[in-house]
Structures are given as structure tokens and as C-alpha cells.
Design a protein with these regions (language model features):
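Residues that define the transmembrane beta-barrel architecture of outer-membrane proteins
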Residues: 42-48, 88-93, 143-147, 154, ...
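C-terminal structural cap/anchor segments
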Residues: 328-439, 443
Length: 496
């Protein structure tokens, strides 16, 4: 379906190009260097070396395309594991058609949407999946395009928007990448993913009202989580015997409804923005019984292995099936304030908070200890709530349940030089939730941008991350994991 869709857009673009209209393009070339502060060793993470945007408008129709080249530095050049010299890939980030009407606009294609009132980390910004390689970037740079249709209708001070996508979008995670500071505790194999089945449509809408002193927005979105969850276990036996069971450990994606409220208050002295989202998520996999592909998890081998070998009876009987049936309510909120201080310094602060309101799930009714990769548990002590991670909302929830951010920005030399100082503090106390202002982890950032010419920019940045050794999660604490990611980076960026 997707190749046919893009072929149709390309044919339409070709037709528009030969008709009346105007075409414009812009982009950049980015030379990027990043190294650890600890030992100056190179950090081999992918980044977008080249980006090209193209716009063509013919009367009330417009085509927009964004093509990027992602460069992935090689850790070596021995060519022992692969003989290919290619170290980049092309990414068509956006390609969509816009039809401007007398009531608004209609967009169809692969596009990046922006929902919410705050500049960054909005819990309402759930339409697109995130690329975690670009987690520390801003705006659309850290999002993945969604194959969708969007509608915007304008009437006086009102705005109505809607979006519909026939595809389920998932986050891009760095898998077993030692260079990336955040890792997933469990990385399932493809065979362990339980198919959503049918057409996993995602849709949402918002209604916005503008006032002289700001605006107010109500929104709703229904879709599937961007991150997988543990959905259940099947226990297989040899015929009627379950003496030596083998397991099929399954993961899936919960279905989530998001109710949102956001707004902006403008004044002569400051601007306040806020977003609040209430999430209701449930596991739709009530029946997880299915045939296996010949491989099942062996507790003795501690890995997936063929379930039928010479001299061993086949595992052909599904004896037990335990769907988790998670049902969770949680909320996320982000409040932002920005103002101008003396000496033309722009001050911005953000407060983020997330918590679980209600949690329920089935219990695994197994008496013996189950040994599963990366989470060994006994039925009496295992609490599935400890595995819960929000599948929608701001990616900031991956780092902490409660943070506060401060940013100072100042320009010099007739806006040719821009200095930014940023700090992020984890104030979520894991031992006593009533103590809300204890600092457990921190991130400090310094960035200097200098416009060498109108088209050439030089950037220098330093990021320092600190965890806390006495945190109850020890090495699993996110800020402890990220300490080694403290780095210095330099960029030379040419715009055209």
C-alpha cells in the first residue's frame, strides 16, 4: 500500500511540476563531531549529515518533501565483517500533498505533526513516533513521519483539526548500541511480537479557541503504544505431558486513549504554556493462544531453541496460556514559563510530572520459578506493575517521573553569536514521593552558535550528566546510565 501511495504522489508532483506554479528548496550540510568528556573517545552515533526540503505550489495545491541522509560513523575500517563502504542511508522524512480550501487545508501523505502548547516535551504530542537516536534534539528532528491524512478548519477565532492514519507507528530504539546511553531492559525477537491483527487505525482531533490573551485547546487521540509491552506467556508440552514445559513469551502493543487539555497565557511580562494529558491504556490481546514456528524458550538453555529435535518428542500441545490483560490509567503534564530578563536574556523554565493513577492486570498462576531473559521472577514476588512503561506521551517520561528544566539564552554581536545554558534536574524521589525537590540526577548543557557568514554556522556544545550512586535503582537508574554520555560536540553547518 505504501509504495502505491508514494507512486501516486510522485505522479501528481510530476504533473504539478509541468503546470503553472513555483518551486523552492532549502536545506543544509552538517559536519558533526562528538566525543566523550571522560576520555575524548569518539561517540559513534548516527546523525543527519544532509537535509533537503522541496516545496512546489500550483494554485491551491502544494507538494512538500523532506529528504535526509543519515550518516552512521564506522567503528573500524577493516572490512572484515562487511566489504561495503557505504556508511549512510537515505530517509524520506516527509512527502505530502496539501490542498488549500476556503475553510482551511487538507494534507495527505507522510508528515510530521505538532500537537500541544509547550515548545518541547508536550504529553499531547502523540501523533508521531519518536526516534530515540535524536532524543536530545528538539522539535521535529526527533520525530518519525506518519503516513496520515490531516484536516485543519478555521472559523473566526476557532480552529478544528483532525488526523487519521491507517498504520501503527512505533518508536525507533537503538538496539544493543553501546554508544547510546539508554538501553531497553528487554529486546524481544520478531517471533515474540503478537500481531495486532486487522487494521490498526489511529485517529485524533482537537478544538482550539484563541483569545486576546492566549488560547485554549481540547484534544482526543486513540492509537496504539509506540513501545512494546509484555503481553503474556504460553506454556507448551510434549503431548499430554508438561513435565518439561517450553514457553512462548509474547510482547505486543496496548491500545491507548488520550484526553488532553492545553493552553497559552500571554502577558506583557511573561508567557505561560501548559499541557495536561490523561491516558487510558489496555492490552487488547485477551486471547494469546497461537502456534509456534518451531522455536520455543527453553528454561534450561535460557534462550529460544528448536522445540523438536532428534530423539525428543515435539512440543505440540498448548497446555496453558496466560494473557496479562493490563489496564492502566496515568497522566502527564508539562508547564512552561518564559520571560525576558534584563540585558535581553531569555529565561525559560519547564516542570514535568508523570504518575500512574490505576493499574490492574492478571497474575501468572505458576508455582515454580520462571527464568526468562532479563527478568527472573517467582510467581509469589513478581509484580507486573514494575514492568509498566508509558507507551504514549513525552519521551521525557523515560528519564524520570518528575523533572524541572531551566534555560538561559543571550545573543551578542548583533545576533551573530548565541549562547544557551540549560539544566535539567530529576526531582522524583524514589523513596518518598512527598519530597518533591530533592535532586537525584542532573543534566547541564552549554551551547554556543556563531554565524560565520549568512549561510555558515559553527556550533560548540558541552553536555555533562550526573547520576546518584545511592539511588535505589543503582545502575538501572537512567541518569546513572547516562553519565558516560557526557560529551563535547562541534558542528559546521552550511545552509542553502
Amino acid at each position: 500500500m505504501r509504495p502505491k501511495f508514494f507512486l501516486s504522489l510522485l505522479l501528481l508532483f510530476n504533473g504539478l511540476a509541468f503546470g503553472q506554479g513555483s518551486t523552492s528548496y532549502s536545506g543544509y550540510i552538517d559536519l558533526y563531531y562528538m566525543a566523550h568528556l571522560s576520555d575524548n573517545s569518539l561517540i559513534n552515533l548516527p546523525y543527519r549529515m544532509f537535509d533537503l526540503t522541496l516545496q512546489h505550489q500550483n494554485e491551491n495545491l502544494e507538494i512538500y518533501a523532506d529528504l535526509a541522509m543519515e550518516y552512521a560513523p564506522k567503528s573500524h575500517s577493516h572490512y572484515l565483517s562487511s566489504s561495503t563502504p557505504q556508511d549512510f542511508l537515505w530517509d524520506l522524512r516527509e512527502l505530502y500533498l496539501t490542498w488549500y480550501t476556503n475553510f482551511g487545508e487538507i494534507k495527505v501523505g507522510k508528515q510530521i505533526h505538532t500537537w500541544g502548547s509547550v515548545d518541547e516535551n508536550s504529553p499531547l504530542d502523540v501523533v508521531n513516533a519518536f526516534d530515540y537516536y535524536y532524543l536530545f534534539f528538539q522539535g521535529s528532528d526527533r520525530k518519525l513521519g506518519s503516513y496520515s491524512a490531516a484536516l485543519n478548519v478555521y472559523f473566526n477565532n476557532w480552529k478544528f483539526g483532525a488526523v487519521l492514519s491507517p498504520f501503527h507507528q512505533t518508536n525507533r530504539f537503538p538496539l544493543n548500541d553501546p554508544e547510546f546511553p539508554i538501553s531497553l531492559p528487554i529486546i524481544p525477537e520478531e517471533k515474540q511480537m503478537f500481531d495486532l491483527g486487522g487494521n490498526p487505525f489511529e485517529f485524533g482531533a482537537f478544538l482550539e479557541r484563541s483569545f486576546s490573551m492566549g488560547d485554549l485547546r481540547l484534544s482526543f487521540f486513540q492509537g496504539y503504544d509506540r513501545m512494546f509491552n509484555f503481553t503474556g506467556i504460553n506454556a507448551w508440552g510434549q503431548g499430554a505431558s508438561l513435565d518439561r514445559p517450553r514457553l512462548d513469551i509474547l510482547f505486543g502493543y496496548r491500545k491507548t486513549d488520550v484526553m488532553g487539555l492545553g493552553g497559552t497565557i500571554l502577558s506583557e511580562w511573561f508567557t505561560v504554556r501548559g499541557d495536561f494529558a490523561l491516558f487510558g491504556t489496555h492490552d487488547v490481546n485477551n486471547n494469546i493462544g497461537r502456534y509456534h514456528d518451531g522455536e520455543l524458550y527453553s528454561q534450561s538453555l535460557n534462550e529460544y531453541a528448536y522445540a523438536a529435535t532428534e530423539g525428543i518428542a515435539a512440543y505440540d500441545s498448548l497446555h496453558l496460556s496466560y494473557p496479562m490483560n493490563e489496564n492502566v490509567d496515568y497522566f502527564q503534564t508539562t508547564i512552561q514559563m518564559e520571560t525576558e530578563l534584563p540585558y535581553d536574556i531569555i529565561f525559560t523554565t519547564q516542570f514535568f510530572h508523570y504518575d500512574t493513577l490505576n493499574y490492574s492486570s492478571n497474575i501468572l498462576p505458576i508455582n515454580d520459578t520462571i527464568n526468562i531473559p532479563n527478568f527472573n521472577f517467582a510467581s509469589g514476588s513478581f509484580n507486573p506493575k514494575n514492568l509498566f512503561t508509558p507507551g504514549l506521551g513525552t519521551p521525557l517520561a523515560v528519564l524520570s517521573k518528575q523533572t524541572v528544566l531551566f534555560s538561559l539564552e543571550k545573543t551578542f554581536l548583533d545576533n551573530q553569536l548565541k549562547i544557551n545554558i540549560l539544566s535539567l534536574f530529576d526531582i522524583a524521589n524514589p523513596e518518598d514521593s512527598t519530597k518533591t525537590f530533592d535532586i537525584w540526577g542532573s543534566l547541564w548543557g552549554f551551547t554556543a552558535e556563531y554565524d560565520v557568514t549568512q549561510n555558515l554556522k559553527f556550533l560548540l556544545g558541552i553536555t555533562n550528566i550526573k547520576g546518584k550512586d545511592d539511588h535505589p535503582d543503582k545502575e538501572l537508574y537512567r541518569f546513572n546510565q547516562m553519565e558516560s554520555f557526557s560529551h563535547i560536540r562541534m558542528e559546521i553547518k552550511y545552509f542553502f
